[in-house]
């Protein structure tokens, strides 16, 4: 079993039950899924760029990405409805905990001038969104093989009802928030 999953089952649930006075252990918020999205605007002119992004996203997450397509045509971007413009991966279960562990322990500390992640990036329903400016922070990405530095969005979806519960859940997992 994954290190974070064991920590959740042994320590985090008890701590959250005490802190928020839950009547049952089943009320404790859990991480439901993690969605990693990479928008590739350059894919409109050159579809090879999208293949590189898909390859990198697969290396980072260990799962084959879904190619996202444009919902609307936008003339100023020379974009037609249905054109491939990005890739996303939805992680659940074991892979989700592996990715979160790698993100917290390895990748975030590799960010340049890292002070911690924002405490305010919650959406009001207990979900946390994190923007990463470059894919090079992940150990699976080889610096020499990267043709363009791309960012990505990481959304951590929890079953928490409030942002405060979700913030506490993530900080119990070791998420480095701003002081």
Curated annotation (Swiss-Prot):
Which UniProt keywords are present, listed alphabetically?
Ribonucleoprotein, Ribosomal protein, RNA-binding, rRNA-binding, tRNA-binding
Q: From the record, give the cysteines joined by S-S bonds.
A: none
- One GO CC term of this entry? ribonucleoprotein complex
SUPFAM superfamilies named among the record's database cross-references: RL5-like (SSF55282)
Species in which this protein is naturally found: Staphylococcus saprophyticus subsp. saprophyticus (strain ATCC 15305 / DSM 20229 / NCIMB 8711 / NCTC 7292 / S-41)
Assembly mode: Part of the 50S ribosomal subunit; part of the 5S rRNA/L5/L18/L25 subcomplex. Contacts the 5S rRNA and the P site tRNA. Forms a bridge to the 30S subunit in the 70S ribosome.
Family recorded in the similarity comment: Belongs to the universal ribosomal protein uL5 family.
Tell me the classification of the organism that encodes this protein: Bacteria, Bacillati, Bacillota, Bacilli, Bacillales
Q: Which GO terms describe its biological process?
A: translation
Q: Which residues form a coiled coil?
A: none
Output the Gene3D superfamilies linked to this UniProt entry: 3.30.1440.10
Work out whether the entry's keyword set contains Zinc: no
User: What job does the chain carry out?
Assistant: This is one of the proteins that bind and probably mediate the attachment of the 5S RNA into the large ribosomal subunit, where it forms part of the central protuberance. In the 70S ribosome it contacts protein S13 of the 30S subunit (bridge B1b), connecting the 2 subunits; this bridge is implicated in subunit movement. Contacts the P site tRNA; the 5S rRNA and some of its associated proteins might help stabilize positioning of ribosome-bound tRNAs.
Recorded protein name is Large ribosomal subunit protein uL5
Q: Which GO terms describe its molecular function?
A: rRNA binding; structural constituent of ribosome; tRNA binding
């Amino acid at each position: 079993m994954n290190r974070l999953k064991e920590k959740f089952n042994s320590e985090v649930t008890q701590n959250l039950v005490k802190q928020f006075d839950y009547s049952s252990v089943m009320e404790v918020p859990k991480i439901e899924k993690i969605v990693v999205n990479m928008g590739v605007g350059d894919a409109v002119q050159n579809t090879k760029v999208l293949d590189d992004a898909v390859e990198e996203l697969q290396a980072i997450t260990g799962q084959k990405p879904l190619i996202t397509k444009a919902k609307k045509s936008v003339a100023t971007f020379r974009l037609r409805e249905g054109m491939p413009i990005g890739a996303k991966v939805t992680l659940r279960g074991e892979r989700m905990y592996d990715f979160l562990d790698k993100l917290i322990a390895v990748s975030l500390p590799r960010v340049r001038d890292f002070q911690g992640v924002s405490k305010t990036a919650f959406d009001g329903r207990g979900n946390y969104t994190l923007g990463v400016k470059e894919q090079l922070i992940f150990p699976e990405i080889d610096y020499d093989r990267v043709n363009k530095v791309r960012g990505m969005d990481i959304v951590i979806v929890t079953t928490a009802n409030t942002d405060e519960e979700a913030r506490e859940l993530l900080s119990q997992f070791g998420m480095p928030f701003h002081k």
